[in-house]
Amino acid sequence: MDETYEENEKVLVHHQNRIYEAKIIKVDPKTSKSDKKKPLYFIHYLGWKEKWNEWIEPNKILKYTDKNRELQKRTNIKASTTSLNNKKNTKKAKEVKQQQQQQQPIAYDSENSDEDENESELEDGGGEDADEGGEDIEDQENNNNNDTGGEEADDNNTSPRSTGSSSSSSSSKSNNNNNNNNNNNNNNNNNNNNNNNNNNKRKRNDSKSSHFQSTKFIDIEIPLSLKNKLVDDWNSINNEKSILSLPKSPNVKDILNKIIEENDKSSECKEVINGIKQYFNKALGTLLLYKFERPQYDSILKTNPKKSMSDIYGAEHLLRLFVKLPQLLVISNLEEKTITQLKDAFEIVLEYLEKNSSTLFLKEYTIASSPYLKAASSN
C-alpha cells in the first residue's frame, strides 16, 4: 500500500536518476493517470526555482526517514559516479579531436571556421580581379601593336594632322598603361593584405588552442551531507523568509584558524587556508549572498564598517564559497604540485565542516520582520 502525504510535508522525490528533497505544496484528490484511487501531489524541489514545481504521482515519493535518506545518498553517489565517467569519456574524446586538429590545422580551419569561409570568398574575389586585369593588358598589347604601325606610317607622311592624332593616341595609351599598372599593384597589395590577415587569424587560433590546453580547472567534490545543508539553508532563507542570526559563533575566521591548529599542516597548506579567508572577505558581498539577505548585509556595513566579513559570517556562507570556487578558479601554467596542494587544502576544510556539522550548522534563523520584508522586496 502506498504512503499518503500531507501539505507542507518534507519528502524525498525520485527525479530522473537521482533523489531530491522536496516539499508537498498541494494535494489533488483527483484521479491520477495510473490509478484512479491515487491522488496527485504538487511538489517543490528544495533549492530549485519555482518553475520546476510539478504534479507527480505517489510512486515517485518517499517518506523523509533516515532509511530513505541513506537510499538517497547511495543513489546520488551512483549517479554522480556515472556522470563523472561520462564527463571523463567526453573530455578524452575532445582531447583526441584536438590532437587530430593540431596535426591537420589547415583542414580543421577550412571545415570548422566561419572566418576562414569568409576569407576563401575574399581570395576568390581577388582571383577574379586579377583575371580581369590580365584581359586589359592583352587588349593594350594589341592596341600598342596597331599604334606602332600607325606611327611608322605617319613618319612617312609628315602631316601635322596625323602627327597630332598619333601623339594624342600615344598619350591616351600611356595613361591607360599607368592606370592598369596601378590597378595591378592595388590587387597585389590586397592579396598581400589578405594573406597577412589569414596568417594573423591562424596565429590567433593557434594561440587560443594552446591557451585552452594550458588552462586547468580545479574540481571540488562537496560531500552529500553538506549539500543537504546548503538545501536547508536555501529553504530557510528563500521559502521561510528567515535570516541567519549574526554575528555567528564560531565565525569563518575561527573555523579556519581551528583547522590550521588541528591539522598542523605544511606552511603551503596554511597559506592556502589563509588565502580562503581573504577570498571570502572579498567575495561575500558580490557572490555569496541571496537577494533576501542583502538588507542585512547593508546594515552590517553601516554598523560595522571596519570589520571583516569572516568575523561576522559563519559556516553556511563559507560552504557557499566552495560551491562557487570551481567557477572562479581557472588556473593556468601551474605545476601539478601546486594544484595538488590547493585541492588538499580544500578537502581538509570540507572534511572539517562535515565532521563538525552538528555544531557549525545550527539552525539559528530569525523570521524576517515586516520592515525587513519590505526592504528586501524593494532591492
UniProtKB/Swiss-Prot annotation:
Residues 111-141 have a biased composition (Acidic residues). Residues 75-212 are annotated as: Disordered. It comes from the Eukaryota. Residues 6-61 form the Tudor-knot domain. Residues 214-377 form the MRG domain. GO terms for biological process: chromatin organization; DNA repair; regulation of DNA-templated transcription. It is found in: Nucleus. One of its GO terms (cellular component) is nucleus. InterPro entries: Chromo-like_dom_sf, MRG, MRG_C_sf, MRG_dom, MSL3_chromo-like. Residues 78-87, 165-199 have a biased composition (Low complexity). Its main location: nucleus. PROSITE patterns: MRG. SUPFAM superfamilies: Chromo domain-like. Keywords: Chromatin regulator, DNA damage, DNA repair, Growth regulation, Nucleus, Transcription, Transcription regulation. PANTHER family: MORTALITY FACTOR 4-LIKE PROTEIN, MSL COMPLEX SUBUNIT 3. Component of the NuA4 histone acetyltransferase complex which is involved in transcriptional activation of selected genes principally by acetylation of nucleosomal histone H4 and H2A. The NuA4 complex is also involved in DNA repair. Also a component of a complex which acts to repress transcription by deacetylation of nucleosomal histones. Component of the NuA4 histone acetyltransferase complex. This is NuA4 complex subunit EAF3 homolog. It comes from Dictyostelium discoideum (Social amoeba). The lineage of its organism: Eukaryota, Amoebozoa, Evosea, Eumycetozoa, Dictyostelia.
